[in-house]
């Protein structure tokens, strides 16, 4: 979900990755406007460079979620991510990937904090990520990614995060939640790529994923401690993206984009994807 996030105070945060000299050096930043978009400033919030064990310095993530102040909690912007790149001695784009991380940004001072509230300053470096922000530590993989590229996060009413990502080791998906001072992990059967988390209630969430020719939804009603499959939506062609629309009309809950169509021209000047919409019976 790449759209800017507004605090309703004239402040807008836009997230993006910075592309540096090497294809596997892509740190993560917020671009912020305090005057409704007239002027912007940059803040590097996650920078894995330099990494001594490998060249996995690309930050990948999915849904970023803004939490307004309420219920005795300060406002914050929740972020979860994984790192990708190459092994030592080579540079390549997203060849391997490992680990899952979480932190949040406090808009009152633009500092980053880990789940326990430790102030990590305006930028989280490689050592701070591993020491303070790890949700899941995985070994350097022999091939592929230890966690999927799309790592999404939402928040429970107590401000603790719910993190959703692929877990290739078990050919499944995972929800990770913070509870009793530690990360708790729920692995559940689900193919496809995570595409967002919708908050339904204090501890209830709908989880979206693309799966070949369609999308699939799951629901948890206990903050990620258990999950059940809810629905499947079938499309004529395989999907590349699926976005849930906040405050949508019932029949326009999902916006979906196909992969390039088999017989379509492969040029930028010609449309070659389908766009679908769908509703969900609440």
Language-model features: where?
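Asp-box/BNR beta-propeller loop motif
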Residues: 33-41, 105-113, 170, 177-185, ...
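Structural motif
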Residues: 22-31, 86-101, 169-176, 212-219, ...
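Conserved blade-ending motifs and adjacent loop-strand segments that build the rim/top face
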Residues: 52-54, 58, 185-198, 227-250
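Beta-propeller fold detector
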Residues: 41-47, 112-126, 185-190, 228-233
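Loop/turn-rich, solvent-exposed surfaces of beta-rich toroidal or solenoidal domains
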Residues: 147-174, 188-225, 244
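Single conserved hydrophobic/aromatic residue that forms the stacking wall/gate
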Residues: 2-13
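Surface-exposed loop and turn segments in beta-propeller and other repeat-based domains
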Residues: 45-56, 116-144
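Entry beta-strands of beta-propeller and related beta-repeat scaffolds
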Residues: 11-15, 72-79, 157-163, 202-207, ...
């Amino acid at each position: 979900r790449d759209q800017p996030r507004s605090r309703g105070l004239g402040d807008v945060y836009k997230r993006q990755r910075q592309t540096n000299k090497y294809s596997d050096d892509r740190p993560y930043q917020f671009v912020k406007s305090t005057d409704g978009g007239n002027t912007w400033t940059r803040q590097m919030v996650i920078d894995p460079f330099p990494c001594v064990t490998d060249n996995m310095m690309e930050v990948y993530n999915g849904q970023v979620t803004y939490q307004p102040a309420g219920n005795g909690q300060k406002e914050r912007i929740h972020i979860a991510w994984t790192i990708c790149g190459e092994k030592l001695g080579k540079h390549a784009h997203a060849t391997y990937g490992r680990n899952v991380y979480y932190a949040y940004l406090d808009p009152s001072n633009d500092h980053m904090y880990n789940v326990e509230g430790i102030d990590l300053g305006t930028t989280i470096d490689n050592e701070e990520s591993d020491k303070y922000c790890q949700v899941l530590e995985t070994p350097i993989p022999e091939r592929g990614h230890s966690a999927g590229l799309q790592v999404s996060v939402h928040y429970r009413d107590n401000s603790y995060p719910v993190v959703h990502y692929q877990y290739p080791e078990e050919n499944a998906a995972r929800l990770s939640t913070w509870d009793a001072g530690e990360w708790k992990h729920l692995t559940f059967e689900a193919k496809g790529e995570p595409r967002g988390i919708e908050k339904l209630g204090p501890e209830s969430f709908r989880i979206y994923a693309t799966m070949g020719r369609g999308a699939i939804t799951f629901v948890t009603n206990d903050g990620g401690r258990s999950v059940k499959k809810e629905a499947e939506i079938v499309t004529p062609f395989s999907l590349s993206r699926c976005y849930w629309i906040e405050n949508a009309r019932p029949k326009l809950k999902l916006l979906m984009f196909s992969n390039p169509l088999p017989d379509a021209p492969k040029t930028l000047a010609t449309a070659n994807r389908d766009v679908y919409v769908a509703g969900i019976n609440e």
